[in-house]
Amino acid sequence: MKFNTIFLVLSIVKFILISAQSCPFSQSIINGASATFYTAIDAGNCGFEKLNGPLGPGNYMIAALGSKLYQNGAQCGQCFKISNSKNASVTVMATDSCHDAGYCQRDNHFDLSPAAFSILGPQSQGVLDGLSYVKVPCEVSGNVKIMMKDGSNDFWTSFFVFNSKVIIKQVSIKLSNSNQFVPLSQTTYNYWPTSITGGQFHVRIESIGGEFIYVTIPKVESRKVYETSGQFSTSCSNLNENNPINYKPQTFNSQQTSNNQNSNTQTPTKQPSPNSQNFIPSYCQQYIQKPNYIFAKESKEMLVLNENENIESNSLKLLPNFLLLILIILLNINF
């Protein structure tokens, strides 16, 4: 009887912990979508410029999102698998916004490239209704990249993050003489501007899954592309592995660059940083809210990475009392 009670308690606890975690990659199929097409597909509002250029996805399977789907730029870089009633489907990346009156004001509307539209129906039809879609990871190669906007200087710069399999939730920066990361605000054109510049600074890129990639940049240089040290996970099962990937910070030597991607954009050679930090996967976020801490999953110990910070975790404080309450209730029921 006691064994059954303990097993039941553990099962309930596991269910509660799993239910409390919202997987950002679990997306349901949305019906009732529509699509049109347009031809001026380069230089969209999401900042990718030429689709086959150094910042673009490398193909023409793209979409301009209706105003409600676009979410003021938050969905830039998200990939969607769109299907029609005849089981034809196409996967597109959001690279632009569609704000025209009419179709673009619908809740779930895509203004597709001609190539993408033609997979779902003839262009002569003009408008396709009765479509469905689901959010999917983007099929990109290599690691996440970051570029500083043209016009960046010692008083202002703006970051463009691209080549990510999932969308970016937050970009934060701190100067070398600071211990505090400052979150930046995303613009409607998918850049992350800041006036915190001057000297070497560190950039922290957070995915929608709660992972972090760190980049150390020596100085402000317009249109310089940096390839980071990692790529984000695309499923919650990957995030919950016993030994999650550690994305170490990268330091770039601005004097050493690889072949130019174009006359304005260069990809520098990476040099490992002597000071490594770990990302905190999403399943740890319910335990730790501070980026300078990491939860040791197997040993269940708190590892302090910054002695100047204090942990405030309501979940850890309340969990023992909650478990004790459940145990008392079940013991009363069984005995």
Swiss-Prot record:
Gene3D superfamilies: Expansin, cellulose-binding-like domain (2.60.40.760), RlpA-like domain (2.40.40.10). Residues 43-143 form the Expansin-like EG45 domain. One of its GO terms (cellular component) is membrane. One of its GO terms (molecular function) is cellulose binding. InterPro entries: Expansin/allergen_DPBB_dom (IPR007112), Expansin_CBD_sf (IPR036749), Expansin_CellWall (IPR051477), Expansin_EXLX1-like (IPR049818), RlpA-like_DPBB (IPR009009), RlpA-like_sf (IPR036908). Its main location: membrane. PROSITE patterns: EXPANSIN_EG45. Disulfide bonds join 46-76, 79-138. It is found in: Membrane. One of its GO terms (biological process) is sorocarp stalk morphogenesis. Coiled coil: none annotated. Residues 249-272 have a biased composition (Low complexity). It holds the Pfam family DPBB_1. Glycans are attached at residue 87. Residues 247-276 are annotated as: Disordered. Residues 21-314 are extracellular. Residues 1-20 form the signal peptide. The chain crosses the membrane at residues 315-335. Keywords: Disulfide bond, Glycoprotein, Membrane, Signal, Transmembrane, Transmembrane helix. PANTHER family: EXPANSIN-LIKE PROTEIN 3-RELATED, PTHR31836. May serve to lubricate the movement of the cellulose microfibrils during cell growth and wall extension and/or may serve to maintain the fluid state of the slug cell wall. Belongs to the expansin family. Expansin A subfamily. NCBIfam families: expansin_EXLX1. This is Expansin-like protein 3. It comes from Dictyostelium discoideum. The gene is expl3.
